[in-house]
Structures are given as structure tokens and as C-alpha cells.
């Protein structure tokens, strides 16, 4: 679904700047082209640290053991880039430290996640990654804004429910 969404965004009239208010894993954002500037925001500090780290050449591991997973989960601030990678890429269902990802076929989730992330990041080398609340993001005039918020009545990164009503009020003010 990321490619069709990116096509719609690229057909949007006007704007030199593309702004994503909730970039997440950048599945859509990595496919958007034709803008001189990309501002990609998310409020998850470890996710943004990971994206910035990979953008700057951080060498992600290809293997993470369950013991390493637990250690990184308990010591996130020792290496925020690695914590972001392991917390999402090596976790069950990609949920932030939602349990060590494993299956019966022995899939190497670290290797799979690294490969996928590096592929997407190849198109985001010039992107500006921002960690913040979407309501406080400085959006340049005439930007094309993409907002794919958390689903209504779901638990967000911090355990708080996303306020969909407040989101729509903020969107109407843009």
C-alpha cells in the first residue's frame, strides 16, 4: 500500500517540502520523490535516533540473541540507535520491545530488518528527521503534509491512547 500512497502524495499540487507528521518506519516516506526537502517527524525518540544513526552510517548488527535483546531493552540509553533498531526490528510484530521475535523456521529478524531499513534509508539520506509532537512541528509554508496517525483507540508508544479528536482539530487548523 506504500507505493500507491506515495504516488498520490507526489501528485499533490504545489510544495517543495514534504512533511510527514508520523513517519514511523518510513515505508511511505521512502517512496516519495520529487521534493527538494523532506521533514520526517515522529515522537518516539529511539526510532528517530535509529533513523538518524543509520542516515549517518551506523553499522547495524545482523544478529541479536535473546540475551542481547533483554540487555538492550534494560539499557536503552547506552546506545539509542541500537535500542531503536532492536526495539522495533527484533521485536514480535515490530511492536516496541514487544518480545524477542522468533518463529519455527528460524527467521533472522535482525538481518531481515537491517536489509529492509537500509533499502528504505537509501532514499532518505537528505531527509531531516525530527523527534517531537506533531502539533508543535514547524511546517514550512506551501508544504505537502502527510499524516498517518495511530489508529483510533489503540495504545501508542508510551502506553497512552492517541487522541483522534484532538488530531482532527489540529489538522483542520493547518
Question: At which residue positions do the language-model features occur?
Answer:
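Class I S-adenosyl-L-methionine-dependent methyltransferase catalytic core
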Residues: 1-174
Amino acid at each position: 500500500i506504500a507505493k500507491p500512497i506515495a504516488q498520490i502524495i507526489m501528485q499533490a499540487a504545489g510544495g517543495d517540502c514534504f512533511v510527514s507528521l508520523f513517519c514511523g518506519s518510513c515505508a511511505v516516506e521512502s517512496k516519495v520523490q520529487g521534493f527538494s526537502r523532506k521533514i520526517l517527524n515522529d515522537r518516539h525518540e529511539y526510532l528517530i535516533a535509529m533513523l538518524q544513526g543509520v542516515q549517518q552510517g551506523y553499522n547495524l548488527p545482523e544478529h541479536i540473541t535473546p540475551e542481547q535483546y533483554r540487555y538492550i531493552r534494560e539499557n536503552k540509553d547506552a546506545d539509542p540507535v541500537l535500542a531503536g533498531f532492536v526495539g522495533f526490528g527484533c521485536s514480535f510484530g515490530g511492536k516496541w520491545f514487544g518480545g524477542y521475535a522468533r518463529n519455527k523456521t528460524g527467521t533472522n529478524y535482525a538481518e531481515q530488518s537491517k536489509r529492509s531499513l537500509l533499502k528504505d534509508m537509501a532514499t532518505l539520506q537528505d531527509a531531516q528527521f525530527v523527534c517531537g509532537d506533531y502539533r508543535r512541528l514547524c511546517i514550512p509554508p506551501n508544504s505537502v503534509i502527510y499524516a498517518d496517525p495511530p489508529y483510533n483507540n489503540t495504545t501508542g508508544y508510551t502506553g497512552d491512547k492517541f487522541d483522534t479528536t484532538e488530531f482532527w482539530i489540529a489538522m483542520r487548523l493547518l
